[in-house]
Amino acid sequence: MSRLEQIFKDAKAEGRAAFVAYYPAGFPTVEESVENIIELSKHADLIEVGIPFTDPMMDGPTIQHAADIALENGFKVKDTIEVVRRATEAGANCVVMTYWNPVLQYGPERFAAEFAEAGGLGSIIPDLLPEMAGRWKAACDENDLDPVYLAAQSTTMERLEMTTHAGGGFIYAASHMGVTGAQDEVDKGAQELVERCRKVTDLPVAVGLGVRDGKQAAQIAAFADGVIVGSVLINATEQGTLVEVAADLAAGVRAKA
């Protein structure tokens, strides 16, 4: 069992889902992102450290806005390594969420080695399909990193089986069709997607895209192994309420509505 899987196993042993928090490195500055990620890690079991990118295909306006601010403030891909290093030293568990282009430009083998050395546990690369990920998979294997893949409601069972077998750590189940961003209601297809994933894999299944508050987190925690939250944490950062929002979400995950 990988270190990433163990995080979900430990949460399950406590009778709850894992709380997974997405936060972009460099937002609003590198130093502040380190501080905020460390603060989040007091509430979240796992941090998805995002790499700001100029052309994100999956990110909604909130995360795009955060990426723009980070890039305007001079963020570089190499800063991700330092953010993860410092967060890990403070006790955070980190995976990276990025698009393939920044990793490719940096050098996949170099990035994997440096990220793992900094304490990283795995990667989520939405635009890198398993059948195209041979080079990255080799780099992950070499550095004991889990490549995490996404599953959507539109994914066929055949495709789902292939994707889950290729991945590691956990499965990222997209709770609704479209880009990231807080939603008013939990998509009814999310639970069905989790059940479909469980038919073809023993990996934990975490649900993301659209969680707005503790109440929604509790609804998802009732059927998923993990609850992934992102956009609302960025909004909370700008409103000065990150600690309160993180605590509310953590309580929701543990409540299981």
UniProtKB/Swiss-Prot annotation:
Pathway entry: Amino-acid biosynthesis; L-tryptophan biosynthesis; L-tryptophan from chorismate: step 5/5
Pfam families: Trp_syntA
Source organism, top-level taxon: Bacteria
EC number: 4.2.1.20
Annotated SUPFAM superfamilies: Ribulose-phoshate binding barrel
Subunit architecture: Tetramer of two alpha and two beta chains.
Protein name: Tryptophan synthase alpha chain
Encoding gene, per UniProt annotation: trpA
